[in-house]
Amino acid sequence: MTDSTPAKPKQHRTVFFVSDGTAITAETLGHSLLSQFPQVEFDMRILPYVDNEASAFDAVGIINQAAHDDDLRPLVFDTLVDPAVRDIINTASACNLDVFEGILSKVSAELGVPAEPIVGSSHGMVDSQDYKSRIDAVHFALDNDDGARTRQYDMADIILIGVSRSGKTPTCIYMALQFGIRAANYPITEDDLDDNRLPKVLKEYRHKLFGLMIDPERLVAIRNERKAGSRYASFQQCQMELRAIQGIYISEGIPSLNISEMSIEEIATRVIQTKGLKRRIG
């Protein structure tokens, strides 16, 4: 007999990333921790530039509203430096998680000098060159998303390829934001797969290519969020595309990675490591 017990519904929890800067650090560390709990569905929200008491009180109002709406305490990851601002955030009806709590004191004790926190410094914004590298990389990723501008590929550090909805765009944006890497991406379409070879525009950049793979069941779920019940989202279509693109990766000697059970952070790290990419920041 088969087990007819219905699957237990996922727990839902709202999460806030609160920062006196861009919230990139809080979000990155928070994502890494939350990825360990796949049985929970997280609604993630960013509250950046909470750098004074007025904005802190506004943030508390938003957090408390979420607690009321969900009838559950949200999780709050923060990288706040100003004690007065942090104290206000800690009054919210939430599980407050100071990302740096306990870490700075241990580092200070080891180094024998006190920490001198600077608002925004945890996000790399105090270094103008890092800031410029980050912004330039993000602009590049956006301009070269989804095969939009192939003429800039000579400037790319990496070109991610894969079927539609296989994680190319978020990975490119993440690498740009976190590491200043100029990442482009190109979707391999059904027409390309029918030809069973790389699109002509990619051939001269083969050394920059990295392929993303995904399990067909996962791809079906993602595509159904966009076009439910369509041929595009059918298992047969997804399986056909993935088998075809795997053949291209093998025949063209393109390194690839199955990202089905991986977080964006893990995908980016593996891509960087495999291709030996140089991080401009971080």
Describe the role of every protein-language-model region:
Residues M1-L33:
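N-terminal accessory targeting/assembly segments
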Residues S19-G21, Y49-V50, D78-D82, E261:
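Structural motif
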Residues R45-A66, P74-T79:
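Metallocofactor- and cofactor-centric catalytic cores in central/energy metabolism, strongly enriched
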Residues N96-D146:
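Hydrophobic alpha-helical segments and helix pairs
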Residues M125, Y205-E241:
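A glycine- and Lys/Arg-enriched "phosphate-lid" helix/loop adjacent to the NTP-binding pocket
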Residues I135-R182:
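Internal active-site segments that recognize and position negatively charged phosphoryl groups
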Residues A183-D194:
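Short beta-strand-centered segment that lines the nucleotide-binding/catalytic pocket of NTP-utilizing
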Residues I248-G282:
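NTP-dependent small-molecule kinase module
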